[in-house]
Structures are given as C-alpha cells and as structure tokens.
Amino acid sequence: THYFSSTKSEKIALFNNVARTADESCIIFTTYHSLRRVVDAGIDIDVAYFDEAHNACTKQFFVPVAACSNFADRSFFFTATPRQSRRHDRGMNNTTVFGNVICNVPAPELINNGSIIPPVVVGIETNADRTKDSAAQIDADTVSNIIDNLDDNQAAKVLVAAPSSRVLGRMLGQSDMIQQLKDRDYHVLHITSKFGAYVDDRKVNREEFFNTLTAWGSDPSKKFVVFHYSILSEGINVPGLTHCILLRNLNVVEMAQTIGRVIRIDRNDAADIASGKLTPGQCQFYRKSCGFVSVPVHNNYGAATIKRLQNVVDAIFVKGIPPLALV
C-alpha cells in the first residue's frame, strides 16, 4: 500500500501518539494476522470493528481478538457466517468476548429489500472420470466448457475456486486453458499465497491486483476469469462478478462466503432501486437478476458437492437460516 504501514508495535504506538498529540483521529487497518502487533502497541482504542469476524474464532487469532475486545471501549463484530462452540470459549456464543447479537438479518429479507440477489445452483454434467493424475486437465477443460455455455450477450465475470494451489498451477501452466480463454476474449487473473498475484501474464502486487479486479468488475464490457484457492473467498466486494465455478468441496462457511461473491447487486440496479425506477426484490427486472454457482459433476466426483451446495442455498436463501458452523 502507498499509505504509511508497519507491523512493528513501537511504530504503531508512535503513529498513534503523534495523531493524538495533534488532536487528530487515528484509524488503523489491520489483518487478523497482524492484530497482535496492534495489541502489543498498548494504545487506547475507542472503537474496534471486526469484519469477517468468524475468523476471530480460530486458535491463531482468538487471543489477540479477545484482548482487543477487552480493552477497547466498544467492539463490533460483523459476519455472514457465525461460528459457535460447545467445547471451548472460542465460539461467537462467548458473550464475554463477542457480546450479544444486536442485529441478525435473514438472507430472504436482504433479497426482498434489494441488498442482494438470489443464487442459482447449476450442475454441469460431464462424461469424465476425475483422478489425481488427470485432475488439472479435467478441471481446465471443464472451465473452458462452462465458459462456452455462458450468455454471449452479457460480459461474464467468473470466479473459479480451484481444488489446490498445486492443481491450479498445473491448470495454468500445463494445459492450454489460458490460451483457450484468451481466444474467447477473456482476461485471466489468479492469486494464491504460493504463487502470488497475476493479471494476465504480468505478476503484480496485491494492491494492483485488487484495484484491477475492482475496476474490471465495474466495467460492463470486461470479460474475465479470476482463479483462486482460498484467498478471495472472504471480504472481497466485486459487484460485477456474475458466475462462480466450484471445482472443490467446501465447508459450510467457505461455501456461503464463496456464494456471497456473486450475489452482490449490480451498481446500476442499486442506483435504479434508490431512485425508484426498480422495485426492490423484483429481481427478474434487474440487469443482474441472480448469481450463478456452477458445479461440475463428473462420473466419479461432484455429486456430493452439488447436493451439499443446494442444501446450503436452500437453508440460507429460502428458509432464512444463518449458516452456523461449529469451531
């Protein structure tokens, strides 16, 4: 980032003290990984906001989150996928750390008031047998085939959840998938903790990657496919994403978070709802009426994934049940 940044506690404390001495507000953004550095800085915190707060329930992050919640004057936790525990104190049902639930909005209400759009699960049947040795080639062919069946009249912006960094690396480097996508006028982006971030053939830093993703997501004429293993599934707000392809089975939280990437309402639809041109909840009249989640079903793989996915979608978006998970 081009803003001042540091993960050294003494520099964080110095930055905060300078701002306070100048009677200026001090806003600190941190990842959960670096939160302990802020805690170690020993600064006074008026308000702490924890986004994607289900991450706070992991062994790695719970202690600094609990410490921050304890000494901050006020703390607020936001998540679409709460985690609870019956065996230890790391669950979000620990009111000492996470407080009481002050707002819980069911997904059907969000659809009806024009905040999100509904997801549609699409099973893509193939005649292939997916094995460890053939996984990369089968998955590469599957992505190309799904892309071929998308609507030519609307520029598609596709998120692909890869089975692993290893398989993704082989899909990108040992098949002709990238060329196949280029021949179809699609840009290709991919990001993993192992290989870093790429825009087409160019390696970029994370800031440029996400800025490009946001800009292209807002451009109606841009067609792109973005591949990831796990780094994108949470907290990435790209309203333009229209399709998601699940190449691997996910747990409930990961499924719900991945679905959430493609059900953001189109910005022009949001503007028309605000002006009264569109009625909230009448999604059939939106430019982007739903978010598609495609799951390949091979001869020996995929049937269980699509069944679990449909159950998760029905529970969240039809019955209004939050996707609770145990930690």
Annotate each language-model stretch with its function:
Residues T1-V39:
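Inter-Walker segment of RecA-like/P-loop motor cores
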Residues D23-V65, H228-S230:
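Conserved RecA-like ASCE ATPase "motif II neighborhood" in helicase/translocase motors
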Residues I28-T31, D73-A80, V225-H228:
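Structural recognition of the conserved hydrophobic beta-strand(s) that form the central parallel beta-sheet
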Residues N55, F195-L324:
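Conserved RecA-like P-loop NTPase helicase motor core
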Residues N55-I116:
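Post-DEXD/H (motif II) to motif III coupling segment of the RecA-like Helicase ATP-binding lobe
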Residues N100-G169, G173:
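Conserved interdomain linker/interface between the two RecA-like ATPase lobes of SF2 helicase motors
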Residues D141-N149, A155-L159, S164-V167, N300-V327:
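Long, largely alpha-helical accessory region at the distal end of helicase-like NTP-driven motors
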Residues S165-T192:
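Conserved helicase motor "Helicase C" RecA-like lobe of SF1/SF2 P-loop NTPases
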